[in-house]
A protein has these predicted regions:
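Basic, helix-initiating cap at the start of DNA-binding domains
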Residues: 1-43, 60-63
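Short alpha-helical scaffolding segments that buttress acidic/His motifs in well-ordered protein cores
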Residues: 61, 94-97, 159, 182
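Short hydrophobic/aromatic patch on the recognition helix
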Residues: 45-55
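Amphipathic, non-transmembrane alpha-helical scaffold segments
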Residues: 13, 66, 70, 122-130
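C-terminal peripheral helix-coil segments that are non-catalytic and often amphipathic
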Residues: 1-5, 99, 127, 131, ...
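Short secondary-structure transition hinges
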Residues: 92, 98-135, 161-168
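Hydrophobic alpha-helical connector segments
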Residues: 64, 75-103, 121
């Protein structure tokens, strides 16, 4: 019986794949969906045959590049929580989410090409993002830094709003200030005793 297991990529093949995805994201974001695959392969330092071995079609490369950005964003959460307080980890992740949204906008035409061909590059992306945000919020609440009544979807909408209002590269300083304001609204604050007593009388 033939094995159906997928063999892990060799180190050099894995490195080539990661290089191709990195170059592809930049190319599709800045040059549009019609950038030649030959130019992507050349910039990654591999032959066109290597590109096609990993990604048989243009659409496959676009979808893989987009999904790789999403995976990197979500997979980085445990390391952030391991190396810094949860509220700082959330603020750092917010910056990364802004970068991810900028990449997504830059790849909009390329992603539409994938969708037109029957693909669904956005499948399960919302669920993965909600899970990532939820992990950060829970850790923050457990550490006493963040409120427990926060819906991860509300945080995602808030960051997306910042990206829409100040998502241009020259607006990053303003975007940072807006994200600071958003995080401030998520912080846990002990009830004011005097206000609580007044409410009880």
């Amino acid at each position: 019986m033939l094995s159906t297991q997928v063999r892990p990529l060799r180190a050099d093949a894995k490195r080539n794949r990661e290089l191709l995805l990195k170059v592809a994201v930049h190319a599709f974001s800045h040059k549009g969906p019609d950038v030649t695959l030959e130019s992507i392969a050349s910039e990654a330092g591999v032959g066109i045959g290597t590109l096609y071995r990993h990604f048989p079609t243009r659409e496959a490369l676009i979808e893989a590049a987009y999904r790789n950005e999403l995976a990197r964003l979500c997979a980085g959460v445990p390391e952030l929580l391991r190396t810094m307080p949860a509220d700082v980890a959330l603020r750092t992740w917010m910056d990364r989410f802004i970068d991810y949204l900028a990449t997504k906008r830059g790849m909009a035409d390329a992603l539409r090409m994938v969708i037109a061909s029957g693909g669904n590059p956005h499948a399960q992306s919302r669920e993965r993002l909600l899970e990532a945000v939820g992990s950060l919020l829970k850790a923050g609440a457990d550490q006493g830094a963040l409120r427990r009544d926060i819906d991860p979807a509300d945080v995602m909408i808030g960051i997306s709003g910042v990206s829409l209002a100040a998502g241009a590269p020259q607006q990053r300083e303003q975007a940072g200030r807006l994200l600071d304001l958003l995080l401030d609204g998520l912080r846990y604050r002990p009830p004011d005793r005097r206000r609580r007593r007044a409410a009880q009388t």
